[in-house]
Structure formats: structure tokens, C-alpha cells
Amino acid sequence: MANIFENCSYHSPYEPYYLNCTNTTNQCTLVQDVETIESIIFWIDFLIPCTLFVVACFLNAYYLSILVPEFTEMNDITKKQYIFMVSRAISALTACVIMLALRILQLITSSFTIYFLFFLIDDLSFYSLLGSYVGSAILLYLATIRPILYSNRISVRTVYKFAIANLITSVVLAITTAMFQAADLSDGPFQCDLKHCQPITNMIMLVLILTSFLIPIVTLSFVLVTLCFYKNRSESIGDFTTDNSVSKSARTRLAWTLFTFTLITLTEAIPSFYLVGTSIGQLLSTWILCAHCYSIPEYEKFGYNIQKS
């Protein structure tokens, strides 16, 4: 079969993807437009995340600069309430810094190691954040509903142990998921494509994502509903031993935590479910690819992200 681009004065790296798109007489201009669109998409995809990472790094660093000095001066009773908050802030700051560095490194190389590190940091920060939200909600529940148990049985050392367990669990999960995610996008120690492990790993990833989202949502919702029922029950029986201001503050903090986690869920769910569905994009037929190329006005309007092998 003749190369439809052989007479073009300029040769684009995207030509191999459109060799079978023969239903056109303007192939040279079309492939140049494709390259322009891909270049714009690439730089937008690079600049916007980098800008957000820089802003997030600044905000997390500022937050830590205020929180850490206060935390060191707290007594043991107060520290129990802030251990997961400090852990969450450190995890977020570390993730922002490393992911910003990895974004820049992706311009230089696309090796399996780079992809693995990128997904490892992303997954580690994600799972540790989920664990910190669950831990904070449980401590808030115990401090409000079971204050005696919270004071006598839950020590600072106990909370530290839970925080370390959360970190270890996050590392194990992150290493497992990052390895398969990186193998989907780059050649690694083992082959993972449509003919081998990808269908199974995509299903495993889907289950892990759904479970990871479900556990914190159920925990936060349960604690929030329990606190609301506890407030109504105390008022109905005339029990005013509980400090109303403390109870109201607990419900407000939990509601904002649930709202914040919902935003995090949305930002993590979109790319995660996109990754789970990559096999669908890889199965696009030639006529669909060519249809996008032929419809260059619509192509320029919406763009089309081609996965490069």
C-alpha cells in the first residue's frame, strides 16, 4: 500500500496513525493540524497541573508552618485530635512536590520507572488521605459519643500506632496498584496489554477504587448521622451534660470533612476510571480514527488524544 503522506513537504510523527485514512485529498494539511492540536493539548495538560501543584505546595507548606509549632506545644489529650491532621498535611505536601517533579521528568523520559514512581506517589497520597479521613472521623465519634472511652482507652501512642498502620497499608496498596498502572502505559518487568493481564487488572483496579471510595463515605456519613441523632436524643430527654458548642463544632467539622472528601473523590475518580477504561480507547477501529481526522473543524473544537506507543 502506498504511503499517502510520501509527497508531503513536511512529515509529522502522527502519520503512522493515519496511513489507512485514504478518503481524503488534503492529508498533508490534516496531519499538520492534528500535530498542532496535540501540541496544544500537551502543553495545556502540562501547564495547568503544574500551576495547581505549585499553588497546592504553597498552601500545604503554609498550613504546616502554622500547624506543626502548635502541635508540638499541645498536651497529649489535644494531640490525639491532630495527629491525623498533621499526617494528612505532610502527605499532601510530599505528594505535591514529588508529583510536580515527576511532571517535569515526563518531558525527558517515559520509562517504566518514571510511570511507576508517578502512580506510586499518587496512590500513596490517595490511600493515606483516605485513611486519615477515616481515622479523624472515628476519633471525632469517640470523643463526642464515648468521651470516657476516648479519655481512658485511647492514648496518644494508640493514635500513633493507627497512623503508622494506615501508612503501611497505604504503601502496600500503592505498590501493588502502581505497578500494574505503570505496566499499562510502558514496557516493564512483565507484559500487561489487552491480550495478557490488562482485563483482569482493570477489574481489580475498579474494585479497589470503588471500595476505597465507599469506606470513607460510609464512615463519614455514619458518624455525621450518629452525631445528629445524638443531639436530637439529648434534647428530647433534657440531657444537657454534653457541651452544645463542642457537639455543634464536631458536626460542622465533620460536614466540611465530608464535603472536602467528596471533592477529592471527584478529582481522583475521573482519572482513575479513565485509566480503568483505557482498553476501550485502545480498541478504537480505524474508521473511527479516520472520521475524526476527516472532520477537522470538529476535531479542532474538541481535540482527540491519541495514545502513542
Curated annotation (Swiss-Prot):
Q: Name one GO molecular function term.
A: G protein-coupled receptor activity
| Domain of life, source organism | Eukaryota
InterPro entries linked: GPCR_Rhodpsn_7TM, Put_GPCR_Chromadorea
Question: Which key words tag this protein in UniProt?
Answer: Cell membrane, G-protein coupled receptor, Membrane, Receptor, Transducer, Transmembrane, Transmembrane helix
Membrane topology for this entry?
A: Multi-pass membrane protein
The UniProt entry, under PROSITE patterns, shows: G_PROTEIN_RECEP_F1_2
Q: Where in the cell is it found?
A: Cell membrane
> Could you tell me which SUPFAM superfamilies the record lists for this protein?
Family A G protein-coupled receptor-like (SSF81321)
- Gene3D superfamilies reported for this sequence: Rhodopsin 7-helix transmembrane proteins (1.20.1070.10)
According to the record, the segments passing through the membrane are 39-59, 82-102, 114-134, 162-182, 204-224, 256-276
Family assignment from sequence similarity: Belongs to the G-protein coupled receptor 1 family. B0244 subfamily.
Protein name in UniProt: Putative G-protein coupled receptor B0244.4
Q: Which organism is it from?
A: Caenorhabditis elegans
